Amino acid sequence: LDQRNPEKPFKLSISFKAPHGPFDGFAREFAQRFEEALIPLGATANPKEAARQPEFLRNSLEGPRGWEMAHDHGMQSKTQKLLRDYHRLVEGLDKGIGEILAELDRRGLGGNTVVIFTSDNGHLHGEHGFFGKWLLYEESIRVPLLIADPRLPAKDRGRSSDALVLNIDLAPTMLALGGVPVPAAMQGLSLTPLLSNPSLALRSSFFCEHLYEHDVNSPVLHIVPSEGLRTKNWKYIRYIKNPGPEGEQLFDLAADPQETKNLLTDPGAAEQLDILRKEYERLRTELGPHQSWSLKPAR
């Protein structure tokens, strides 16, 4: 900011590592925060939910730590320490963001600067019997997204939207907010219409994937690659290297937002399964060959 031309607009991108491992990497000023707190896990962090997962997932990199957390209901001291440390990292992040906003105000820029806050992934803390960010469950794929535009009229501020939006929408949104034309080649959509009309539906579905496998030679260090299709009310997941019934999942998110009942073989969901499979296959073909990769390729 000291070096910017005050006569021109600026775009500043700030990336925080937190909250990310090592989870005890928080600033020492937060070391006593949450010390007496008992932090609960999500509703699906329980033995029953963990046990229903297919073996290839339970034995993968996400499984053992999440299994342990789910089976002790998060009450073990080391689980509570991890959760407290995670919250300490988030508090440090919150403080850092506050300092940035205060600095913008100090420079007289706060009233003319759009601030966008988001994250690159969610995180499972024992939910469904997993720990990490590698699977397509809601806890893993959903992230916060806040857009604060001081130019908006008061009636359009502080509103929320349940529209399906993606990280690829951020670049078109920033261009549009800055009055720059959005190139037709960009796959994302500008989110600016949502700022005045949060109920607007920008898309009806999206394709999602996680193809990084880490170490394909080790079951306990292997991340199971997956792809899926998410609509407003349904989610279809396919574990692309695990064919057969256990390699697919179908969830009715309207009736089962916690994703506890796989409807893959439910006759009542057969029509919806067929629709989602066909749309998945269409997008899969459009994307071309899989690009899965690993730090340690198969021997």
Question: What residues fall within each predicted segment?
Answer:
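Short amphipathic alpha-helical coiled-coil/interface segments
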Residues: 276-280
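Intrinsically disordered, low-complexity polar regions and short flexible loop motifs
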Residues: 256
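Conserved SAM-binding loop
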Residues: 89, 252, 265
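A general structural motif at alpha-helix termini
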Residues: 195, 264-267
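Active-site-proximal cap/lid insertion segments
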Residues: 1-8, 12-165, 177-185, 238-244, ...
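Carboxylate-dense, calcium-coordinating segments in secreted/extracellular and ER-lumen proteins
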Residues: 259-263
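C-terminal cap/loop subdomain of S1 sulfatases and analogous C-terminal strand-loop tails that border
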Residues: 121-127, 168-171, 176-249, 253, ...
